[in-house]
Amino acid sequence: MARYLLLAAALLLTACSSTPKKPIADDPFYAPVYPEAPPTKIAATGSIYQDSQAASLYSDIRAHKVGDIITIVLKEATQAKKSAGNQIKKGSDMTLDPVYAGGSNLSLGGIPLDLRYKDSMNTKRESDADQSNSLDGSISANIMQVLNNGNLVVRGEKWISINNGDEFIRVTGIVRSQDIKPDNTIDSTRMANARIQYSGTGTFAEAQKVGWLSQFFMSDWWPF
């Protein structure tokens, strides 16, 4: 009975330890930053044109300060392939010829004293893994911080509700202001310390998850 209780406890612990934290919309970590603009004092000059509200037709529209919006073009592609194998062979062979004494075989209970023993073992294991992923699209993010060297910390998320579930994209990383294109976009491959997450919640996402019993058989707790 104790063995069954221990096995049940191990199954429960495995299931609990492998349950990831569910993502939520409006996560404070991805909340946008709203810069505080100082109040603008407009002098009453009687003219329609105001210097404080003027903008150049040739000014740079690229994001460069906290709160600005930048569009990140997702161009991610990864491919990994790995194969491994090992083979172990072991064998032993031992022979003991009959023992003679006084011109006759020594015996025990009428059975001659001789020995022949042979043993062999052959273990072979092979494993192959081939995985490829790609992600294309775009997402707009906010500049959260401007570092001392001019690099920009960007972060943002996008949630899309479809039927009975939600799909989301989250992006965070560090970009150089020099890598931002004139149309205020930057490729995701130009981001440092990039964290790109594309997943979903709801019925469709839950259907793709592995059950807790299957997780146990595929975990390190399974002894075979």
Swiss-Prot record:
A lipid is attached at C16 (N-palmitoyl cysteine). One of its GO terms (molecular function) is cytoskeletal motor activity. A lipid is attached at C16 (S-diacylglycerol cysteine). Pfam families: FlgH (PF02107). Residues 1-15 form the signal peptide. One of its GO terms (biological process) is bacterial-type flagellum-dependent cell motility. Its main location: membrane. PROSITE patterns: PROKAR_LIPOPROTEIN. Belongs to the FlgH family. The basal body constitutes a major portion of the flagellar organelle and consists of four rings (L,P,S, and M) mounted on a central rod. This is Flagellar L-ring protein. It comes from Shewanella oneidensis (strain ATCC 700550 / JCM 31522 / CIP 106686 / LMG 19005 / NCIMB 14063 / MR-1). The gene is flgH.
